[in-house]
Amino acid sequence: MLRTVQGFSLIELMIVVAILAIVAMVAYPSYSESVGKSRRADAKITLESYAALQERWFAQNNSYTNDIANLGGTASPEGHYTMSLFIDCDSDATADTGGTYYCFKLTATATGKQSGDRCATFTLDETGVRGYSGTGGSKDHCW
């Protein structure tokens, strides 16, 4: 009486492993891009929120604040970006000092796992002009 052997051969197992490897190679870049895109929302939401707080500050004080702590601090809520505030109304690339400020530029710089993102830095100024810098992508892609 012959016994039938049940199970998988080594060849069948290797084919399954190869198929899984191909699927992983195709899926991982899409997954990474999706995660990066969702983390970018952290920067965009924080910039928009800080800009709104700047406008509120301006309405109450007739000047924008030059202290990021008045807007919520240097870390974005989810911690993927470091926020900074730069006041340079005369465009001489040095921070303005004095009492009354009529311009501002907010910057969100990627940190930690997000630092390798192709849209690494986002900016927003008092007129609502959005900017970005990084290794690739377009303004529409990043924003």
Q: Where does each model-flagged region fall?
A:
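Periplasmic/extracellular, small/polar-rich flexible segments of pilin-like filament-forming proteins
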Residues: A59-W143
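Juxtamembrane interface helices immediately C-terminal to a transmembrane segment
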Residues: V35-A43
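N-terminal single-pass transmembrane signal-anchor helix
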Residues: L2-Y31
